Amino acid sequence: MMQLRYSPTSPYVRKVSVMTIETGLSSQIDRVLTNPWDPQTDLGATNPLGKVPALITPDGAEIFDSRVICEHLDAMHDSEPFFPLEPKTRSIALRLQALADGILDAAILRLIEERRRPGEYCWPVWCDRQATTMNRSLDWLEERRSLLDSRLTIGSIAVGCMLGYLDFRYADEDWREGRDGLASWYSAFAQRPSMRDTVPVE
């Protein structure tokens, strides 16, 4: 059995969880609930970065981060690969994943700054910069929504998990406004069983 260190609210964990479902590997993974913010956590022994997700293989190898874990899982099933082999399709999938993960990075940095720091230490300019990054990147996705029309890849999985996280943590900011194409795509994508089964919860 593989072991997955996870947090139920992490969008990066969700990406891995969706992959395990889509690849049919869920039964081969033992999930271990982990709070990376707990000062007593032993997560650092598995991932020296102290982050989830982290995967431990049956032979004891530690695999991180989510991108590497997903590619590792993709090599373990016999269906069509989620990391495409054809160069152009692969480039699109990897770019979509990079953009989705970058939006998440900005969203989480902003979340920590705005909601975790004491108000007197919050840096508004930093938060505005992250918000600009998020919105500019979402606009890029809207303008190139057709990139999501191909078969299921790591790119579409990453984008779907990212948009789900924005609904989860930024429900008061409507990312759908002015992005009808992206909103329509996500409305359908969110109905996949792998997405319904991995909705984040506190």
Give the ranges of each region predicted by the language model:
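Residue-level recognition of oxygen-bearing side chains
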Residues: 68, 181, 194
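GST-like domain detector, emphasizing the conserved glutathione-binding G-site
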Residues: 1-124
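Charged phosphate-binding loop/patch that engages nucleotide di/tri-phosphates or the phosphate backbone
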Residues: 184-198
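GST-like fold's C-terminal all-alpha helical module
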Residues: 100-187
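Short coil/turn segments at secondary-structure boundaries
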Residues: 112, 199-202
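Short coil/loop linkers at secondary-structure junctions
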Residues: 26, 79-80, 174-176, 196
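Non-transmembrane alpha-helical segments in soluble domains
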Residues: 70, 74, 94-97, 138, ...
